[in-house]
Amino acid sequence: MMALLLLLAASMVSAVILTAATSSARRLENDRTARQAYLTVSSAARLLRDDILNASFVQETVKTTYTNDTSTETSRETTSPTGFTAAWLKAGKAAVDRDSGKSFTDTITLSVDGLDDVSAVFTMAPNYDITIVLHLAGGGDSDCRLVLMLRENKADPAVSTVSGGGLWVRDVTTTTTTISWSPDNATIEKEAVVSKS
């Protein structure tokens, strides 16, 4: 009888140990999956950040004022982004410039062989600030959501004026406007999650 009780106690202890080991293994797997999700999403965020930080728009506007008080003005873009985010940045700037006061939003999926796809929601505000929300395209319990924010430098335009220059020309004013983003104004943070009650 005592042997039966010991056998029963040993079985119960074994069941508890087996349950704890299974739970621990599941938790380790979930931690590994969450860590991999974070590494994938944060790598995508850093890749986008670095490309945008190397991008800029430079526009030059030349206003020629004549001696009869008339003037002409021409504008041209002398520099524009060339990296893999160039299409996003150009579309965002064009939309913001066209629809003054409205933000531009677009979503893409970033794919790299051997890694999970990352969904990125790009928003350019009317002041050219950029917010990109990134997460695993497949979602899931171990998903990691990060927010990349880049603030536009807000540099004043460079203005130079040359007087004279011709028989009918009074002065030529060149205004150079630069839109760019600085590492000092770039952050990557976890997205705040609001729980539903």
PLM region spans:
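Conserved functional hotspots that engage anionic ligands or polymers and/or phospholipid headgroups
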Residues: 1-2, 50-197
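Aliphatic-rich helix starts adjacent to a transmembrane/signal segment
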Residues: 5-39
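Membrane-proximal N-terminal amphipathic helix
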Residues: 26-58
